[in-house]
Amino acid sequence: MISFIRGTLVGSDSESALIEVNGIGYRVAMSYHALSSLGSKGDEVLVLTYLYVREDALVLYGFVDEEERSLFERLITVSGIGPKV
């Protein structure tokens, strides 16, 4: 599992952030709350992550603190609830 990513914020949209780490760009799906607290383009950021693995996709979800990530991990264990941000 990828526990966190520290790198440069390259950009973001309404659902995700693009973070560059040593020349590799990671697209991280995040909530509006998390995205709004990241900072500005070019800032160094630290994002806690959860790698969601399905047979047809790998999705990296990002969080601003451990409480938010723990809640996400508990919610996705409930039948019928998926990880969509």
List the predicted regions and their residue ranges.
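Glycine/alanine-rich phosphate-binding loops at beta-alpha junctions
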Residues: 1
